[in-house]
Amino acid sequence: MSNILIMDNGKKKDLQSATFERLLKHLDERKYVQNIDLMDLAGFCRNCLSRWYQEEAKKRGIDISDLEAREHIYGMPYLEWKKKISEIIIFL
């Protein structure tokens, strides 16, 4: 029997959480990939992830602002990220 089928819910959630954090790290290491390109190619972007994060928090009775959700997804305050990404794009 497959390990995934017999895995308890806690381990499954732990793996999903670790995978999500790895996705965020992957995106963070590729700041040059613009949200519009992600949206065109994958149908979602960093802003979508932050909105989904906020929506899931709300379902669980946790109030997270747009800026707080974006800070979690972007790994820094959103305005700081926008400034850095504009510098990266100009450099490229």
Please annotate each region the language model reported.
Residues 2-92:
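Domain-level signature for proteins that mediate thiol-based redox and metal-cofactor handling
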